[in-house]
């Protein structure tokens, strides 16, 4: 009986916490679709295509190839695609 009450209180608390911390989504889809449509018409307007910072060939990239401008990171050094 006590365990059931504890579980019910925990579920109610987590549900309330989810609603309190959630973003205001009333106009989320309304603003999302025109932006996506604009990005489909002009792919260069997409934020995903922009690179804020990338490393030139010969610099240390760790194990994340996405940091290199050429997308090639082999043994921890950015490689160039030019042959």
Curated annotation (Swiss-Prot):
InterPro entries tied to this protein: Conotoxin, Conotoxin_d-typ_CS
Subcellular locations according to the entry: Secreted
Keyword terms: Cleavage on pair of basic residues, Disulfide bond, Hydroxylation, Ion channel impairing toxin, Knottin, Neurotoxin, Secreted, Signal, Toxin, Voltage-gated sodium channel impairing toxin
Domain of life: Eukaryota
Positions annotated as propeptide: 23-51
Main location: secreted
S-S bonds: 54-69, 61-73, 68-78
GO CC, any one term: extracellular region
Tissues expressing this chain: Expressed by the venom duct.
Coiled coil: none
General function of this protein: Delta-conotoxins bind to site 6 of voltage-gated sodium channels (Nav) and inhibit the inactivation process.
Protein family per UniProt: Belongs to the conotoxin O1 superfamily.
Protein name: Delta-conotoxin-like Ac6.2
Organism, scientific name: Conus achatinus
